[in-house]
């Protein structure tokens, strides 16, 4: 079993950092690198690319809205064309920096409010995916399973890789419990270990209501801003390996056998 472990990386500006990116890069197999709008700057982006290259980690763009004060979690009013431009601009910036270091951007993982806006509008989602396809038809789209983003990626001719979020609670419909709701964020190590083991062995997760639902995923995400994120990511990786799995970058997970 090949499975990816990913985290959002380079989420800072100047000397400010969200997490220990150096430590996290030694654990994950794919890095979603902030591209300068909600977080990130050219120096940080370049450092993340170099770290990923040193550790054999796949590189992905993590575009967000230009909401620095709200860390990209506040929705903003943009037309569909404007939003497509924001996405392409950020991916393009990371692609250029990566190419300059002899690396390639392989995937896209939308950040917070940007992802929420795209994922509730079929027409907008398709426009965004078509814009990404024009930029690079080999790009992989990270999404949750059975979502507008996953369907739009497929319709646009892009490959997608589905996620299980180790540090976020799900409701009975398989949706993420909104941040700010009690129990939405899961940072207790034993709980994360149990959730990941259940997903790996049974393909299910216990919802916040106490029900069991199926989860279809090829990658496990740990948010870098979750308290103890590095330790949680290490737990995720150890559970995969204990189950006989191989942790490998997204492009290798979905590559033809």
UniProtKB/Swiss-Prot annotation:
It catalyses: 5-oxo-L-proline + ATP + 2 H2O = L-glutamate + ADP + phosphate + H(+). Its EC number is 3.5.2.9. Belongs to the LamB/PxpA family. GO terms for molecular function: 5-oxoprolinase (ATP-hydrolyzing) activity; ATP binding. CDD domains: LamB_YcsF_like. InterPro entries: Glyco_hydro/deAcase_b/a-brl, LamB/YcsF/PxpA-like. Catalyzes the cleavage of 5-oxoproline to form L-glutamate coupled to the hydrolysis of ATP to ADP and inorganic phosphate. Keywords: ATP-binding, Hydrolase, Nucleotide-binding. GO terms for biological process: carbohydrate metabolic process. This is 5-oxoprolinase subunit A. It is an enzyme of class 3 (hydrolase). Forms a complex composed of PxpA, PxpB and PxpC.
């Amino acid at each position: 079993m090949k499975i990816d472990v990913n985290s959002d990386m380079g989420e800072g500006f100047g000397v400010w950092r969200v997490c220990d990116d150096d430590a996290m890069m030694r654990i994950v197999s794919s890095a979603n690198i902030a591209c300068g709008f909600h977080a990130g700057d050219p120096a940080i982006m370049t450092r993340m690319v170099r770290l990923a290259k040193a550790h054999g980690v796949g590189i992905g763009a993590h575009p967000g809205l230009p909401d620095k004060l709200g860390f990209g979690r506040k929705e903003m009013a943009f037309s569909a064309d404007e939003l497509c431009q924001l996405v392409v601009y950020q991916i393009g910036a990371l692609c250029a920096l990566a190419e300059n270091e002899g690396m390639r951007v392989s995937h896209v993982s939308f950040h917070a409010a940007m992802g929420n806006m795209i994922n509730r509008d079929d027409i907008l989602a398709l426009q965004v995916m078509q814009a990404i396809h024009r930029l690079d038809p080999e790009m992989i789209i990270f999404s949750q399973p059975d979502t507008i983003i996953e369907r739009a990626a497929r319709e646009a001719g892009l490959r997608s890789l589905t996620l299980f979020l180790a540090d976020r609670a799900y409701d009975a419909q398989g949706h993420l419990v909104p941040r700010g709701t009690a129990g939405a964020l899961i940072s207790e190590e034993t709980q994360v270990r149990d959730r990941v083991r259940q997903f790996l062995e049974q393909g299910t997760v216990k919802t916040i209501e106490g029900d069991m639902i199926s989860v279809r995923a090829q990658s496990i995400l740990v948010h870098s801003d979750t308290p103890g994120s590095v330790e949680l990511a290490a737990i995720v990786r150890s559970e995969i390996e204990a189950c006989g799995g191989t942790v490998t970058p997204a492009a290798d997970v979905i590559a033809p056998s």
